[in-house]
């Protein structure tokens, strides 16, 4: 069987207890390069560790190759842990992986992870909702699969809630320009956070 788990964002100690237990018991762990490598120390000594290197801009494995690997390893028996940065279902392609497992008849379970979209602003002292200021928050990709900006900037600029762009540092100037062009005030409070949930976190 396959367990698809979120490792949490940033430092290793943000993984959930359920994720930690899965690490200790798995026979194979297929992990992203975004996770804190110290998490692998919790695995059994004989556990097979396979890095699939998913990172924006440099993928060592395609999503299709990862899907195939999950099915193949599950067919060999034992517990296969797919460990993903943050939460598997927040821009983590977890849905694509369970679709492949369903098609192959492979049983699976899911373990949520702490998502950077909420945890990183919190660690910077920024609430994503605040009474009287923001009654909603919206999580948006900072770039699409073909490295373009997302659509619907007119809606984002006028929604009135907190906007959280993930993986958007490279496109930051254009994101800001598009929001302003579509009606967002130039004096709207904003923050840019890098290396979130680590000792190197920086916010401006």
Residue ranges and their predicted role:
Residues 1-2, 99, 107-109, 115-204:
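Beta-strand/loop-alpha-helix module characteristic of Rossmann-like adenine-cofactor folds
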């Amino acid at each position: 069987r396959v367990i698809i788990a979120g490792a949490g964002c940033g430092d290793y100690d943000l993984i959930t207890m359920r994720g930690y237990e899965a690490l200790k018991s798995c026979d194979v762990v297929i992990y992203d390069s975004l996770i804190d490598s110290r998490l692998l120390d919790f695995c059994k000594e004989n556990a097979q560790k396979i890095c699939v290197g998913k990172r924006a801009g440099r993928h060592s494995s395609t999503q299709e190759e990862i899907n195939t690997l999950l099915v193949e390893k599950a067919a060999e028996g034992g517990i296969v842990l797919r460990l993903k940065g943050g939460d598997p279902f927040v821009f983590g392609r977890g849905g694509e992986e369970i679709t492949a497992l369903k098609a192959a008849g492979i049983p699976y379970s899911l373990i949520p992870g702490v998502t950077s979209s909420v945890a990183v602003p919190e660690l910077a002292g920024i609430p994503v909702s605040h009474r009287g200021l923001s009654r909603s928050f919206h999580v948006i990709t900072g770039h699409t699969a073909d490295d373009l900006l997302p659509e619907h900037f007119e809606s984002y600029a006028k929604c009135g809630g907190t906007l959280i762009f993930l993986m958007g540092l490279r496109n930051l100037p254009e994101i800001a320009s598009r929001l302003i062009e579509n009606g967002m005030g130039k004096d709207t409070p904003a923050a840019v956070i890098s290396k979130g949930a680590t000792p190197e976190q920086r916010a401006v």
